[in-house]
Amino acid sequence: MILMVCRWNCTNPEYPMNSKIAATFLTGHLRHKIGDSRKLCVAFSGGLDSAVLLAGLAELRDTTLPQVELRALHIHHGLSQFADDWMAHCQAFCHQRNIPFSAVKVQVDAQDGGIEAAARTARYQVFAANLAENEILLTAQHLNDQCETFMLALKRGSGPAGLSAMSADSSVHGYRLLRPLLDLSREQLEEFAAQLQLSWIEDESNRDARFDRNFLRL
C-alpha cells in the first residue's frame, strides 16, 4: 500500500493558499453543491479525491452546518493484497474526524465486462442496499475524471448519447447521487489535501495500463 501524506510549503510564491483559505474555499464550495441536503453518505475509498471530499464535509459540519448527518461507506473489493490495510486506514481517518464509518466486503465477478465494470456494479449494488431514507450518496469524481470519461467514450466509438458528461446531480437505482467535485481538478484537490495535511491511499492498480482509464493517464 502506498500512503500519501502531503504537507504544503507555504513559502512557495506560486501557491499562496494557506490552510484557512483552503478550508474556507472547500467548505463554501461544498455547501453550495449540497444545497438543502443534510443526510449525507460519502463513498469513501481512502484515495485523494474522497479524502478531500469527506474532510471538507466534516469541516463544513463542524464549523457551519451542525445539522448535517455525515457518514462514510467503504467498499472492500478484495482485489488488492492491501485491501484490509485500506479499510483500516479509512476507519482511522473517520475516527479522527468523528465520522460514522461502515465497510462492506463484496465479491467481484469479472467474467462479464472486465474487472473495472464488475467492481463498479458491485459498488453501486452496495450503495443501493445501504442508503437510508432521504440519504444522499456523494462520490468524489473530479474534473480530470470527467475529461477521461469523455475520452474513453471517444476511444470506444460511442455515439452522441454516449459522449454525454457525468452529471453533478443525478439519480441511480432510485437514490440521489451528487458529485460535488466535478468542476475541481485533481491539482486543486492536491492543493487542498496539502493545506489540510491529509493522508490518502494510492492504489497500485492506478499504474496498470491494462485498465482503460489508466491507459489514458500513462
Locate predicted features.
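Core alpha/beta nucleotide-donor-binding catalytic domains of modification enzymes
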Residues: 15-218
